[in-house]
Swiss-Prot record:
This is Sulfate adenylyltransferase subunit 1. Residues 25-239 form the tr-type G domain. It catalyses: sulfate + ATP + H(+) = adenosine 5'-phosphosulfate + diphosphate. Pathway: Sulfur metabolism; hydrogen sulfide biosynthesis; sulfite from sulfate: step 1/3.
Length: 479
């Protein structure tokens, strides 16, 4: 067993008290990215090692693996703690996104170790999509490279506002301050092309030797700033969703018996209270919240990120994929949008193609109308293209088969982010972030006759397996 963990449990007064203390710690999700062989996996291994998060059997296994696959001579190869795939160990690189978990007395952490190679851009984008902070590793011998710029751009494209530029392998440049200062200046010059609201910090370190990772380095007394771990423990993460209006995508209609009907999902943004008036999109029908049900019992109020079940005061038709928001909020469903796309399939994305798209719990179809440009992610220039290749990133104009309630991705990643699904293989082939909305093409409400409404209700009541939708919600049944 991890001896430091055992000591922490003893200090808290037992396992139950320790688990309660863990629940009240804040959580930081971050990723490590950079060029090939910059030391990303080694850095994560060093963080786990120096925060005493490695169990004794893991340490013993690491000694054996270092002898077989290690690249550090007689020293422990800490990268092997993270590089789990056989192909990764044989090549000495990271291919897949590897997730690791650790905690300190101040915070809990989820780490995503992402690949540095350009052909694995899609893996890196997947890792970045759920993170709050990015650690960009730079080899002190090489300085700012194209892949550094590429990963910086992808991180900011996916909404990450906190960047920590970790200038690694300072031991190989004799810990020179002028090397650190030059790379810092080069990166700041490049960062002028990135969004202006970023929090960028610089830390000189050596992941192999442990300098400035979890403890201050005696070899770089000229650096008076915090260690990398101190930055991670103290960075103030202000999530945009906390300040955004209430959005609740319905994931599941929970009806265990005739006396209960609730709508389950995760509150994407804002907050909701018992008694609050809400509106359902796309139907526009209003009601009020009767109960907020959670695993731990009913609550009076829920905040962004909480998994809840809402019970309403009125019996109205709500299905998976519908969006609940405050009754006084205005969000016009749109059929046309400009989407930043990260393409993940071998077959290029081209105008005229159609795909299934999934947004939160909503699934529909969309057609690619045009590709405005592809971004050269090595120098951030835009160029005209006829198609978007594997790992390509570009701005694409799309039309949806039905109006969707969308937000701009930078404001709300849940209701502004979507995935592309191949209809035949059901494989995810791309990720999209809403950049612009065009509400002019929204379909006007359709007026149905009383007979049509009665027939629709009859079909939904007696033939539920047809999965017919409520016409009042502008949803058309499908056999």
């Amino acid at each position: 067993m991890n001896t430091i963990l055992a000591q922490q449990i003893a200090n808290e007064g037992g396992v139950e008290a320790w688990m309660i203390a863990q629940q009240h710690k804040s959580l930081l999700r971050f990723l490590t990215c950079g060029s090939v062989d910059d030391g990303k996996s080694t850095l994560i291994g060093r963080l786990l090692h120096d925060t005493l998060q490695i169990y004794e059997d893991q340490l013993s296994s690491l000694h054996n693996d270092s002898k077989r696959h290690g690249t550090q001579g007689e020293k422990l190869d800490l990268a092997l703690l993270v590089d789990g795939l056989q192909a990764e160990r044989e090549q000495g690189i990271t291919i897949d996104v590897a997730y690791r978990y650790f905690s300190t007395e101040r915070r809990k952490f989820i780490i995503a170790d992402t690949p540095g190679h350009e052909q694995y851009t899609r893996n890196m984008a997947t890792g970045a999509s759920t993170c709050d902070l990015a650690i960009l590793l730079i080899d002190a011998r090489k300085g700012v490279l194209d892949q550094t710029r590429r990963h910086s751009f992808i991180s900011t494209l996916l909404g990450i506002k906190h960047l920590v530029v970790a200038i690694n392998k300072m031991d190989l440049v004799d810990y020179r301050e002028e090397t650190f200062a030059r790379i810092r200046e080069d990166y700041l010059t490049f960062a002028e092309q990135l969004p202006g609201d970023l929090d960028i910090r610089f830390v000189p370190l050596s992941a192999l030797e442990g300098d400035n990772v979890a403890a201050q380095s005696a070899n770089m007394r000229w650096y008076s700033g915090p260690t990398l771990l101190e930055v991670l423990e103290t960075v103030d993460i202000q999530r945009a969703v906390d300040r955004q209006p209430m959005r609740f995508p319905v994931q599941y209609v929970n009806r265990p018996n005739l006396d209960f009907r609730g709508y389950a999902g995760t509150l994407a943004s804002g907050s909701v209270k018992v008694g609050e008036r809400i509106k359902v999109l796309p139907s526009g029908v209003e009601s009020s919240v009767a109960r907020i049900v959670t695993f731990d019992g009913d609550k009076e109020e829920a905040c962004a990120g909480e998994a809840i079940t809402l019970v309403l005061n009125d019996d109205i038709d709500i299905s998976r994929g519908d969006l609940l928001l405050a009754a006084n909020e205005t969000l016009a469903p749109a059929r046309h949008a400009a989407i930043d796309v990260v393409w993940m399939a071998e077959q290029p994305l081209a105008p005229g193609q159609s795909y299934d798209v999934k947004l939160a719990g909503k699934k529909t179809r969309a057609r690619i109308e045009a590709i405005r440009y592809q971004i050269d992610i090595n120098n951030l220039t835009q160029r005209d293209v006829e198609s978007l290749p594997l790992n390509g990133i570009g701005l694409v104009e799309m039309t949806f088969d039905e109006p969707l309630a969308l937000d701009i991705y930078q404001q709300n990643p849940v209701t502004g982010g979507l995935i592309f699904i191949d209809r035949l293989s059901n494989v995810t082939v791309g990720a999209g972030m809403v950049r612009e909305l065009d509400e002019r093409g929204a379909t006007p409400p359709v007026e149905y006759s009383a007979f049509e409404l009665e027939l629709n209700a009859l079909v939904r009541r007696h033939f539920p397996h047809w999965d017919a939708r409520d016409l009042l919600g502008d949803k058309h049944g499908a056999a």
